[in-house]
């Protein structure tokens, strides 16, 4: 589903990142501490009183050597492009500066709600001065302290009130998928090729932001929704070529997808940014397919495909479950396989298994490889049950969860995978003590 997006905007040194981290707090969802997964703090999940949303720290998007005013202008434009609600941060001790007024003028043009937060309002004397900020023209200023957490409740109440109302439309029964990857891996060409291959385009549906377009189509009698095709296709703004902006855009697409297609460039191999966006898809628990694009451009021998597969398995060890497809947007090579594979991964992502069969598999696994012991005490597994889908999540009841070593948990996971076919989806095992 698409979550409301809140962008934090303001000139340098007003405390944007401090406020961002304070609101995110421990609500950032990290499924597991996976080696090789890099987290990017410019985009985060957050929640207030049961309402979940996403936050962007525009100050975290580095514009390189651009002049100061150009940087804050671009950051404000990102907020206007990407957000449903904008939080404009100023500094109480410093008062209104020329840079604040520059940002304000840009935000006036936004057809988006703007909430004014006066940061560093740490004491009553400073808070009394916030009324000067009415002159910026954004209504009531909210005094806050990112460092001490003061005033955040009132600020977040105001933010949540501005979220778009849910329209009550019928639940989307299509499979939602996105193509993610760094610039120049060929996402735009893949989008055009996939939508041009005898597909029935149903409609372009505007998302929660001005330029996020989802494209619906039908293939093999299955309904699909390609998420954020506009975000992949659009070009022209300076910041759209920055790595951190493209990572942020990928994170948003992942959040709104059932299945994620991680696109690699066969000519360039695997880069750190490839790992970053793939790692976020894994942590978000989405179904994943790895696409190696521009496969037609490589000179090949009998070992080329196998060598590239092995490289992917080494560099993306945490994605051992993800199928790999070598494709070419230019020639159409293997693109006809994608709808069927996306559907298969989506089905696996939502698969439920019977408890009786699950426990037979677990007990057979234990007979094959007995549970570990420590100081004469052996781990005892009593039973397992599935508690969630998307991704499939299982609770294993044991005598002592601390005795479940990572390697044995991985063994049980592999046995469950092998029996039930969970290709393309992560699965989670949670150990609990039986009371």
Swiss-Prot record:
<dbReference type="InterPro" id="IPR005225">
    <property type="entry name" value="Small_GTP-bd"/>
</dbReference>
<dbReference type="InterPro" id="IPR015946">
    <property type="entry name" value="KH_dom-like_a/b"/>
</dbReference>
<dbReference type="GO" id="GO:0043022">
    <property type="term" value="F:ribosome binding"/>
</dbReference>
<keyword id="KW-0547">Nucleotide-binding</keyword>
<feature type="binding site">
    <location>
        <begin position="57"/>
        <end position="61"/>
    </location>
    <ligand>
        <name>GTP 1</name>
    </ligand>
</feature>
<comment type="similarity">
    <text>Belongs to the TRAFAC class TrmE-Era-EngA-EngB-Septin-like GTPase superfamily. EngA (Der) GTPase family.</text>
</comment>
<feature type="binding site">
    <location>
        <begin position="228"/>
        <end position="232"/>
    </location>
    <ligand>
        <name>GTP 2</name>
    </ligand>
</feature>
<feature type="binding site">
    <location>
        <begin position="119"/>
        <end position="122"/>
    </location>
    <ligand>
        <name>GTP 1</name>
    </ligand>
</feature>
<dbReference type="InterPro" id="IPR027417">
    <property type="entry name" value="P-loop_NTPase"/>
</dbReference>
<comment type="subunit">
    <text>Associates with the 50S ribosomal subunit.</text>
</comment>
<feature type="domain" description="EngA-type G 1">
    <location>
        <begin position="4"/>
        <end position="167"/>
    </location>
</feature>
<dbReference type="GO" id="GO:0042254">
    <property type="term" value="P:ribosome biogenesis"/>
</dbReference>
<comment type="function">
    <text>GTPase that plays an essential role in the late steps of ribosome biogenesis.</text>
</comment>
<dbReference type="InterPro" id="IPR006073">
    <property type="entry name" value="GTP-bd"/>
</dbReference>
<protein>
    <recommendedName>
        <fullName>GTPase Der</fullName>
    </recommendedName>
</protein>
<dbReference type="Pfam" id="PF01926">
    <property type="entry name" value="MMR_HSR1"/>
</dbReference>
<feature type="domain" description="KH-like">
    <location>
        <begin position="351"/>
        <end position="435"/>
    </location>
</feature>
<dbReference type="Pfam" id="PF14714">
    <property type="entry name" value="KH_dom-like"/>
</dbReference>
<feature type="binding site">
    <location>
        <begin position="293"/>
        <end position="296"/>
    </location>
    <ligand>
        <name>GTP 2</name>
    </ligand>
</feature>
<feature type="binding site">
    <location>
        <begin position="10"/>
        <end position="17"/>
    </location>
    <ligand>
        <name>GTP 1</name>
    </ligand>
</feature>
<feature type="binding site">
    <location>
        <begin position="181"/>
        <end position="188"/>
    </location>
    <ligand>
        <name>GTP 2</name>
    </ligand>
</feature>
<dbReference type="InterPro" id="IPR032859">
    <property type="entry name" value="KH_dom-like"/>
</dbReference>
<keyword id="KW-0690">Ribosome biogenesis</keyword>
<dbReference type="GO" id="GO:0005525">
    <property type="term" value="F:GTP binding"/>
</dbReference>
<keyword id="KW-0342">GTP-binding</keyword>
<keyword id="KW-0677">Repeat</keyword>
<dbReference type="InterPro" id="IPR031166">
    <property type="entry name" value="G_ENGA"/>
</dbReference>
<dbReference type="InterPro" id="IPR016484">
    <property type="entry name" value="GTPase_Der"/>
</dbReference>
<feature type="domain" description="EngA-type G 2">
    <location>
        <begin position="175"/>
        <end position="350"/>
    </location>
</feature>
């Amino acid at each position: 589903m698409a979550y409301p997006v809140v962008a934090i905007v303001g000139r340098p040194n007003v405390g944007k990142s401090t406020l961002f981290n304070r609101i995110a707090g421990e609500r950032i969802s990290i499924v597991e501490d996976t080696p090789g997964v890099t987290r990017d703090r410019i985009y985060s999940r957050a929640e207030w009183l049961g309402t979940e949303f996403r936050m962007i720290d525009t100050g975290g998007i580095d514009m390189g050597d651009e002049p100061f005013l150009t940087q804050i202008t671009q950051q404000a434009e990102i907020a206007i492009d990407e957000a449903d609600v904008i939080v404009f941060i100023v500094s109480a001790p410093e008062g209104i500066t020329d840079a604040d007024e520059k940002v304000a003028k840009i935000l006036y043009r936004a057809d988006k709600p703007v909430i004014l937060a006066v940061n560093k309002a740490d004491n009553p004397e400073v808070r009394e001065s916030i009324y000067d900020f009415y002159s910026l023209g954004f209504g009531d200023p909210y005094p806050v302290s990112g460092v001490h957490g003061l005033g955040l409740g009132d600020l977040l109440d105001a933010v949540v009130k501005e979220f778009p109302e849910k329209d009550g439309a019928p639940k989307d029964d299509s499979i939602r998928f996105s193509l993610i990857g760094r610039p120049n891996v060929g996402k735009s060409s893949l989008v055009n090729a996939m939508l041009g291959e005898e597909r029935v385009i149903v409609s372009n549906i505007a998302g929660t932001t001005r330029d996020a377009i989802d494209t619906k189509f039908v293939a093999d009698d299955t309904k699909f929704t390609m998420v954020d095709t506009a975000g992949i296709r659009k070009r022209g703004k300076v910041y759209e070529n920055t790595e951190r902006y493209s990572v942020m855009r990928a994170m948003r697409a992942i959040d709104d997808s059932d299945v994620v297609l991680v696109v690699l460039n066969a000519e360039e191999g695997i880069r750190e940014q490839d790992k970053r966006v793939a790692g976020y898809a894994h942590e978000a628990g989405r179904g994943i397919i790895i696409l190696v694009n521009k496969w037609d451009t490589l000179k090949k021998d009998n070992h080329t495909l196998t060598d590239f597969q092995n490289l992917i398995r080494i560099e993306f060890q945490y994605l051992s479950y993800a199928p790999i497809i070598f494709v070419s947007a230019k020639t159409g090579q293997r693109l006809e396989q994608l709808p069927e594979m996306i559907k298969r991964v989506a089905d696996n992502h939502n698969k439920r298994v019977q408890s009786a069969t699950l426990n037979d598999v677990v007990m057979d696994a234990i007979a094959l490889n007995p549970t570990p012991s420590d100081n004469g005490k052996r781990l005892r597994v009593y039973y397992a049950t599935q508690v969630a889908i998307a991704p499939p999540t299982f609770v294993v009841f044991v005598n002592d969860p601390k005795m479940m070593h990572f390697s044995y948990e991985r063994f049980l996971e592999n046995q469950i995978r092998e029996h039930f076919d969970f290709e393309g989806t992560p699965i989670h095992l949670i150990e609990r003590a039986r009371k």
